[in-house]
Amino acid sequence: MKQLYTVISLLFLFTHTAWAQQHEIFNQRIRTLQVVGGTNWLSLPVSSLGGEPIHIDFDDMTHDYHRYRYKIEHCDANWNVTSSLFESDYMRGFNDNQIIEDAEQSINTNHPYTHYHLAIPNADCQLTMSGNYRLTVYDDNAENEEEGKMFTACWMITEPQPLVKLKLEATSTTDIDIQKDHQQLKMELDHSQLRITHPNQLNIVVLQNGRWDNAVINPKPDYLSAGKMNWQHVRALIFDAGNEYRKFEFLDTDHPTMGIDAIDWDGSDYQVKVMTDSPRPNYVYDEAAKGSFYIRNSDNVENNNTCEYAQIHFTLKAPKLPGDVYLNADWTYGRFLPEYRMEYDEMTKTYHARLFMKQGYYSYQYLMKMEDGSIRLLPSEGNFYQTQNKYNVLVYYRAQSDRTDRLVGYGELK
């Protein structure tokens, strides 16, 4: 028993810096990439072996059909491609030169586009191993593979039946403050079905609102018992409470809907102004999704190929801040790119950004990137213990006979 405790303790001394489950777009023709497990667009793209399919949707901003082929790779817990596996180890069917056949052109839209859809599993390939997966899409007509690389999409597959049991609880009583600015995540993990003899066999990832920029990797438990680990007062699991995400719905090109101040037509584009976001000195409950988005219009029929694209204008009223201010949400794919960075107007004391976006419901927040690369909440956004944050926990395990990490447990606390 003492030897087991030593192994478990050593496990949480290992740190990882490359962890990231982030989609990435390489070609500006690609817009509105969505990866959803089943129909649960409000959560991480997670499904189980034999469970609901993973849906990948995206738009190509042309009206021409492109032969898009895809390749699926299994990744370890650190999101590195598992080179020690054969494709037959994690997949049945074919993985080379598979074409995305489900495509439909937009109908009566100002900006023509072609919508593509892919579901995994499908008739050509079925996944047979739990863990992390990365799909890369290529334009088959490109001169070479690097030029034809369009985007990558990531998702997670759990075991058909969890091999661990997770209990999660969030409290506003923390070692930093009580019912003020922070939340403490408490966890209990029952791993009695697993045989752990080496510190690298178990990896635990904790996310707040699906964000990977502040992910906590392998937090050290403060209680160990036979087959169980407990995190009750772990400093690493104290999170800034933040505030509820902001939101808007752009559903109609003629009439402003929720969160929209004005819609104008300039002869070539719809210019949509989101209501100015002002400082929030007090907490106000709001059921906004935690960065999620959902494509639809007021008719809510054939949303994939009838929704318009428009220039969406964001305005944030705030003093000049010491770091760069970014829009952050699932639809920014966790990336701090120039297109999501806001510019400051000294005359109006406001930040501004303009993005080319498709009709739908969007939730978002503002984050600040400091010169040292650290990410912080904006002081003007508020920090309140009552905030309804979402916490996700991923538990990876590699048995002695395994050549990669499997996802043996997944928990979500809303």
Placement of each model-derived feature along the sequence:
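Short acidic/polar inter-strand loop motif in beta-rich domains
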Residues: 77-79, 125, 139-150, 211-212, ...
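Long, internal scaffold/assembly segments composed of regular secondary structure
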Residues: 197-283
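Basic K/R-rich, polyanion-interacting modules in nucleoproteins and related proteins
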Residues: 272-321, 405-414
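Ligand-binding face of N-terminal immunoglobulin V-set domains in extracellular IgSF glycoproteins
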Residues: 110-140
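Bacterial Sec-dependent N-terminal signal peptides
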Residues: 1-22
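Low-complexity, Pro/Ser/Thr- and charge-rich linker/hinge segments at domain boundaries
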Residues: 157-180, 385-408
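Aromatic-rich carbohydrate-binding modules that target alpha-glucans
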Residues: 91-116, 212-219, 224, 311-359, ...
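Contiguous beta-strand segments within globular domains
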Residues: 28-76, 177-189, 299-314
